[in-house]
Amino acid sequence: MFWQKEIETMPRKELEALQLERLKWIVDYSIRNVPFYAKRLGEAGVTAEKIKSLSDVTYIPFTTKADIRDNYPTGLFGADMKKIVRVHASSGTTGKPTIVGYTRNDLNNWADQVARIAVAVGVTDEDIFQISFGYGLFTGALGLHYGLERIGCTVIPASSGNTEKQLMLLRDMKVTGLVATPSYALYMGESAKESGYPMSDYKIRIGLFGSEGCTPEMRTQIEKVWGLFATDNYGLSEIMGPGVSGECIKRCGLHIAEDLSLIHIYEDLGYSRRRQDRQRVHPVHHLPVPARPRVRRAYGGGVRFL
């Protein structure tokens, strides 16, 4: 099932040509609009004209977390504030939060990106979704909210907490889809069983869970207590938010929106590798986001080849 079938089923050769075109564009745009990148890429001798293939990405210097902190709050923005219509921020648990801005076009692309991962797991315009993420600077709630609305779903912005009221809405509104963290979905399920209402009063058929890790055991528990189809998705506020990747109905791993994100896997960036050697770090370019371009951003996330 596809939301933007032409893009999502694009032949590999055409996709890589699009990635190259967008990579060159974002490099040129960043040099012209972000002083930090004008200096950093200039020192490295990188220009859009010198990028002839996707493998040339290795000539581009990494953008690190320290670079983000040093340019707080808007030093890496690539658009004037009058063009920024939304601001989100990371939690800032290790220091100052990362401020991310969105132009109107960014928000439009983001909604389609989220719509893709939702449709891929069976969401339709007949679904009624309750979003039990906390609203605010966190990208998760509003990201899923507008993506689901884009599909045509009815969206209930319940936010987090007040579990008794959450359960009442699930029952009374005959909610068919739930957005929550896996741990809160489990807690809600246990609370529902203790509430005195039969579980048959709940009509949830699908869950879009994220914002924290979900073990296979947790997924099994969630599906058992709710009788729903549990799915996982992934995103970072720095790139866009939820929608960077997500499962499909086969649940064979997370599918990346490769027309929008160029992800490369590296082994020796100086990060400590945990557990098995198959884990790597992944630098990312989010290709078409002019509000705050990220050029070869090293996120340090672990990945595993399946």
Name the predicted role of every residue range.
Residues 94-97, 136, 182, 237-239:
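Gly/Ser/Thr-rich beta-alpha loop segments that engage phosphate groups in nucleotides
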